[in-house]
Amino acid sequence: MYSVMKAVYDSGIPISFKCSMVLKACLFEAGFLDETRHTVDIDANWNTDTPPTAEQMVESLQRAINRGGMDYEVRLYRMYGEKRSAGFELVDRNTDEILFTMDVDVNRPITPTQIYEVDGICFRGVSPLQMIADKVAVVSTDKVFRRIKDVVDLYYISKVFEFDVQKIYSTLKCSERTMGDFQGFLQRKEDLRHSYDKFRFAGGVNKPPFDAVYREVKIYLKDVLPKEASKEYADGSQQ
């Protein structure tokens, strides 16, 4: 998948990558094993002055992949719309097997990006700060029960990046997102555990124990949690 991302980057398509593939790159650079965070899809942002047509997107991606020497066919299975990303399948031309998918948001608020490198492969991705802010925004609302993987991601992120509360708030504001009250995360721990138990990483990757994940993420987020929850840390009574 990183080869596809490199081909897109080399082509000049106005795409920046985000989510799992960026996190994997950060973890890999920090010394984690490649299989720590496995994924079967690529997430990205496409930002242009003029909204691209379906044909323009498919043709641009296909041309980039062809130039990269990969025998894949790009197929659009979902056109983008309001609050809906474009969905692409990358298909092996020889077997017609769907190798992985790409979800591409189009002309959402522009976010800070940087160049990443994994084993000599370069691509443009959202900044670590943006990645953290996006995941905190999810965990702060009841979306956390559907996006339990963001809790796991924050567990790993906490081992690599410091949490700068002022920069997080600023990043959320710039990307037109808000932070919730964390009531689901704080008050419904057993429901979270249930969601976590059902969740399976792609590729058969082993999950760390839920209690360890929950404890470390709660500590990591202490500066944005409600005062009552934050006070636990001052009293030494965190759970």
Q: What do these predicted regions represent?
A:
Residues 1-15, 25-38, 42-239:
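Structured mid-to-C-terminal alpha-helical surface segments
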Residues 20:
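An acidic- and aromatic-residue-enriched active-site/binding cleft used to recognize and process polar
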